[in-house]
Amino acid sequence: AVPEGNPKGIESFDQLAELLKSGDVLLAIGNSDVPVGQYTQKIFAYYGLDESAMTDCLTYGNNVKEVTTQVSEAAVDCGIIYATDAFSAGLKVVDSATAEMCGQVIYPAAVLKGEKEEAAQAFLDYLQTADAMSVFESVGFSPAN
C-alpha cells in the first residue's frame, strides 16, 4: 500500500524490488515475529532481496497496525500490509502478493463442542454463503475455496 498521492509512483512488487535494490525507497514492514513480517520475509526471498543489506530502506512495526499507520501518515513511501488493513485505512493497494510469493493467508474457522454448538455451526454455515463472501470481498478479503 502507498500513502495518499503515491509520491514514489510505486505500482508493483517488481518495481518495489528494484527500488529496494537501488536504495531509493523507504518501506515499512512488520517485525519478523509477527505474521505480516513473516509474509514480507517470504516476499523478499522470492525477489532475492537480503533484508540485512536494506537497513537504510526499511522501517519496522510491531504489528500490521503500526505499519499501516506509517503508510497513512506518509512517513514511508510504501508498506507491505494486508489488503483489509489498507481498505480500513483508506489506502491504495498497488499490488497484491501471490501465493507463489509468500503462500496464501488463511483464516480458519471451526465449531467447538459446547453449549452453543448449534449457534456456532449456524454462524459457520453463514460465513460460507454467497452473501458473506460478498461482504468479505467488499472489505478486501478474497473468497474462501
Q: Which sequence ranges carry the predicted segments?
A:
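Exported/periplasmic ABC-transporter solute-binding proteins
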Residues: V2-N145
